[in-house]
């Protein structure tokens, strides 16, 4: 039986029973992102992360619920601190780039003035030389 949702036509049995290729793709994506999540958790956590199961059906809540809530809150605080540090670093880089742009604008104006001044001196000397005033 075919159904249509937002312009996408699909077989309901295909949604309920995905092909082995789709299942393998989903499992490999789950595996990839679960290891990335474990690595990020290890970066922000002071506690070591337990080894991840390769089975996506495995229950990840092996720790007591209270401990995991406290640990999650601690991790959120650390992530917030890291985000604020990254924001501060980004702001510093932005301010430095603005300052360098202003300095570059000042140098460009000075270069233009020096070029203009020496060009006028050269024209004046050329005038005196041609009229035998020197």
From Swiss-Prot:
The keyword Transit peptide does not apply. It is found in: Peroxisome. A motif (Microbody targeting signal) lies at residues 131-134. InterPro entries: PXT1. Its main location: other. One of its GO terms (cellular component) is peroxisome. It comes from the Eukaryota. Keywords: Peroxisome. The keyword rRNA-binding does not apply. This is Peroxisomal testis-specific protein 1. It comes from Homo sapiens.
């Amino acid at each position: 039986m075919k159904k249509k949702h937002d312009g996408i036509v699909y077989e309901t049995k295909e949604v309920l029973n995905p092909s082995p290729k789709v299942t393998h793709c989903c499992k490999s994506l789950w595996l990839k992102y679960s290891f990335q999540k474990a690595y990020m958790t290890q970066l922000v956590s002071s506690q070591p992360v337990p080894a991840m199961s390769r089975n996506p059906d495995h229950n990840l809540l092996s720790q007591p619920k209270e401990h995991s809530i406290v640990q999650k809150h601690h991790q959120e605080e650390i992530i917030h601190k890291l985000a604020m540090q990254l924001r501060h670093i980004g702001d510093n880089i932005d301010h430095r780039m603005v300052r360098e742009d202003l300095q570059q604008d000042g140098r460009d104006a000075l270069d233009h003035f020096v070029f203009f001044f020496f060009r006028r001196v050269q024209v004046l000397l050329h005038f005196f030389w041609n009229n035998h005033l020197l």
